[in-house]
């Protein structure tokens, strides 16, 4: 059994920083379920695990593989409750094609800031069969360790892109672009298409003005009962779940 050097632990901890992740083009994942989901989807540069985990997974393909004690793993881990394995994976390179949005249902995020929200939205996209999420340049980094953990493995199947949202939406032509607004139409009373882009906004400010002007289908998630005083808004991840569920419900009945 090897022990992790101080330099290796320092390197693992440095992956909390976007600058280092970007330079190295890697990301960190922890825990048996998450690491197990990602192995086979992304090249693994480094994996450290306890002997009990390695015995259950004898055929790991990693550039560097180290058996470590639980104590060592605890020192390296970024989690409050360290688990049996952590791994460093290479970031994938994806090409963003507007045709994907014309042909299927995709999500767009306008400056979502919370890593947990982004991770949960990726997990939701995975559940609802949405393959692409297009993020504004100021949206939180998908490879933030907190985001990766919150995806629960969804990052293996959902492609996340960063671009200028206004420019991308303009490239879609007359493709349906949906967004939620207080003055939008009740989404339960509107026919929703099986293709197009659903735009979700920033936690505090909603969808930005420039992007809002480009949305051609304004929706509203009604509270119940109508007109009753309620909380100001839904969390962006919860709102995404409600909207995606209605899109898929309507698609199932067509």
Labelled PLM ranges:
Residues 1-3, 29, 66-69, 158-167:
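Short acidic-hydrophobic, aromatic-tinged amphipathic segments that line or gate anion-handling sites
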Residues 31, 113-121, 231-239:
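Amphipathic alpha-helical repeat scaffolds
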Residues 65-90:
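Glycine/small-residue-rich loop that forms an oxyanion/phosphate-binding "nest" at active or ligand-binding sites
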């Amino acid at each position: 059994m090897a022990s992790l050097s101080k330099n290796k632990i320092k390197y693992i901890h440095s992956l909390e920083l976007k600058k280092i992740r970007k330079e190295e083009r890697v990301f960190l994942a922890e825990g048996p379920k998450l690491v197990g989901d990602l192995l086979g989807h992304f090249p693994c540069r480094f994996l450290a695990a306890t002997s009990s985990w390695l015995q259950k997974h004898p055929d790991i393909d990693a550039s560097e593989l180290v058996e470590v004690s639980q104590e060592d793993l605890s020192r390296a881990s970024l989690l409050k409750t360290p688990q049996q394995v952590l791994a460093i994976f290479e970031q994938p390179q994806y090409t963003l094609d507007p045709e994907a949005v014309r042909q299927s249902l995709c999500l767009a995020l306008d400056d979502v800031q919370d890593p947990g929200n982004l991770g949960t939205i990726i997990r939701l996209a995975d559940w609802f069969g949405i393959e692409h999420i297009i993020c504004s340049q100021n949206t939180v980094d998908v490879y933030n360790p907190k985001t990766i953990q919150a995806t629960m493995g969804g990052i293996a199947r959902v492609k996340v892109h960063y671009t200028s949202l206004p420019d991308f939406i303009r490239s879609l032509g007359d493709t349906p672009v949906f967004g939620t607004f207080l003055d939008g139409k009740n989404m339960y009373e509107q026919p929703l298409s099986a293709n197009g882009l659903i735009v979700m906004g920033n936690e505090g400010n909603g969808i930005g003005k420039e992007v809002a002007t480009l949305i051609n289908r304004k929706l509203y998630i009604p509270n119940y009962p109508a007109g009753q005083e309620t909380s100001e808004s839904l969390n962006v991840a919860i709102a995404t779940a409600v909207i995606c569920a209605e899109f898929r419900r309507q698609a199932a009945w067509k």
